């Protein structure tokens, strides 16, 4: 039976790299045993749905492979957009452009932050770049406001002294590398 529904993923017709990626992914042997995403985390996410009572053994592996292919496709499309703009780095604006121009990524439109087109300034020293955005108290006054510590906000902004706060349930490096006694979340 022929499927005339265009809602499924089609290989892109305009770019050889994307065509090659999808043709290899669709016709090749999908090795779902080697995965990039932690399977235990995927199982936990699947179990959050109250309608899910049992999970087949291969379902988390297939979902991991699907996520890997999805991220790779979005990254490749963003990279191509960055190259079209004569840049070597993928920016928010590249991901935003890909999401807004590609029909299959419509579901991400509300979740990908819009790039406001902020001017790009090349900073030689990252501390100088952060210091421009931090309010510095007037040092001509002998007394500083209570609770003011000079130097700490700049260092904290760079993540030197303390780790950034993490959302509850977010992945950590330990989850990805398997530092909890597992082998990468398997």
UniProtKB/Swiss-Prot annotation:
Main location: nucleus
GO MF terms, alphabetically ordered: DNA binding; DNA-binding transcription factor activity; protein heterodimerization activity
Entry's transmembrane regions: none
GO CC terms of this entry: nucleus
Functional summary from the UniProt entry: Stimulates the transcription of various genes by recognizing and binding to a CCAAT motif in promoters.
Quaternary structure and partners: Heterotrimeric transcription factor composed of three components, NF-YA, NF-YB and NF-YC. NF-YB and NF-YC must interact and dimerize for NF-YA association and DNA binding.
Name of the protein this chain belongs to: Nuclear transcription factor Y subunit C-5
């Amino acid at each position: 039976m022929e499927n005339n529904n265009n809602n499924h993923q089609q290989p892109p017709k305009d770019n050889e790299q994307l065509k090659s990626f999808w043709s290899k992914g669709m016709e090749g042997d999908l090795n779902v045993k080697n995965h990039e995403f932690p399977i235990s985390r995927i199982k936990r996410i699947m179990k959050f749905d109250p309608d899910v009572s049992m999970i087949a053994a291969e379902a988390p592996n297939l979902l991991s492979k699907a996520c890997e292919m999805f991220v790779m496709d979005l990254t490749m499309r963003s990279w191509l957009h960055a190259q079209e703009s004569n840049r070597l780095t993928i920016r928010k604006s590249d991901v935003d452009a890909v999401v807004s121009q590609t029909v299959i990524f419509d579901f991400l439109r509300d979740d990908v932050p819009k790039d406001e087109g902020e001017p790009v300034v090349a900073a030689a020293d990252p501390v100088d770049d952060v210091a421009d955005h931090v309010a510095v108290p007037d040092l001509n006054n002998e007394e500083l406001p209570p609770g003011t510590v000079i130097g700490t906000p700049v260092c904290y902004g760079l993540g030197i002294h303390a780790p950034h706060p993490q959302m509850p349930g977010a992945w950590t490096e330990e989850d990805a590398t398997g530092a909890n006694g597992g082998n990468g979340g398997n």
